[in-house]
Amino acid sequence: MDEIDKKITLLLQEDARMTITEMTEHLHLSRPSVTERLKRLQDTGIIEKYTARISLDAVGKSIQAFLRIENLKIPCKKFEEKIYEEYRILECYRVTGESSYYLKVAVHSMKELEELIDFVIPFGTVKTSMILSSPIPYRPIITD
């Protein structure tokens, strides 16, 4: 990736709906050049997909937490299959250390959080940390 490719990825991370015409204006490049670069970035897997970020607060899921799963009672693959369909689990990280997994969850109410914890408890020890705020809710990836 050269500097222009890096600029393209930054522009798209800020606004995935940016048109090729708008990119040509920002980058001072021709339309065919930008189109070719975009295709290459997609073909090589650097750009995986175009998405929208949804405000959890705006959709009523203002209660967020991390669930740390320790002492897993079933094989990792089986655990991952069980939690995959649970839509309230936004992110899942397999980690080293005392915990096996960190789950980032978002729910409408404390009752719903309790239900989600009850769903996960059979798989291992669950420790919960409520998210108070997120000083860095999203940061564009800067490529070196």
Locations of regions flagged by a protein language model:
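A compositional/biophysical signature of low hydrophobicity enriched in polar/charged and small residues
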Residues: 1-144
